[in-house]
Amino acid sequence: MAIATLGPVVIDCPDPLALAAFYAELLGGEVKADDPTWVDVTGFAGTPLAFQAAPGYVPPEWPRADRSQQFHLDLMVEDMDAAEERALALGARKLEADDRTRSWRVYADPAGHPFCLCRG
């Protein structure tokens, strides 16, 4: 028997509102910002996301064995090329996305967190 349910995945960042807007656009969600240091993104299929201000935030580096990425999000998409175009237009950057034969591509969000666009 479970003792808990999963709430939102909370992501540290320097600008919660900006990063929430990025993911809301990618996922088709809605930004809820009652406090500028904590911003929620809801209204899309899947686990909700929350973004919290982190003073002194240092983004992860990809790939780097001596400094872990700590987590990444797998975002399931129908059209990899269209999703990549949209993600890049919203401020993502490519990390490992040149091999078009794989079923995933790795990017960084505007705050530097890695995420994957996955065919699915």
Predicted regions located by residue number:
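A short, acidic/glycine-rich surface segment
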Residues: 56-62
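Vicinal oxygen chelate
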Residues: 2-8, 14-16, 33, 40-41, 49, 68, 73-111, ...
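Short connector loops at helix/strand junctions that flank enzyme active sites
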Residues: 36, 44-46, 66-70
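N-terminal beta-strand motif that seeds the catalytic metal site of vicinal oxygen chelate
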Residues: 1-20, 26, 71-77, 118-119
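Glycine-centered loop/turn motif at secondary-structure junctions
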Residues: 27-28, 91
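Generic beta-structure capping elements
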Residues: 44, 52-56, 120
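Short, charge-rich, low-complexity interaction segments located
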Residues: 48-49, 60
